[in-house]
Amino acid sequence: MTPESVMMMGTEAMKVALALAAPLLLVALITGLIISILQAATQINEMTLSFIPKIVAVFIAIIVAGPWMLNLLLDYVRTLFSNLPYIIG
């Protein structure tokens, strides 16, 4: 196992992790921003008012993007397992 192969595997793992986390984080960010704007406009400062919609939005995003996320993760794991003999040496 060469240092280049370790770096390549690490880079691919980070790309997959970022691709899996990005949609959920963006949904939470956009939902939080919208709720914060509404709270500022109505002067309602309730912490649970921003927390519950974020959870619901992320849950919906998981349902919508779940098959794509699962496919991406399975493709990465299949590639990793198929290259295992070459990695071990």
Curated annotation (Swiss-Prot):
Superkingdom of source: Bacteria
A family per Pfam: Bac_export_3
UniProt cross-references to InterPro entries, sorted A to Z: Bac_export_3, FliQ
UniProt entry tagged with the keyword Transmembrane: yes
Protein's cellular compartments: Cell inner membrane; Bacterial flagellum basal body
PANTHER family: FLAGELLAR BIOSYNTHETIC PROTEIN FLIQ (PTHR34040:SF2)
Protein name, as recorded: Flagellar biosynthetic protein FliQ
Gene: fliQ
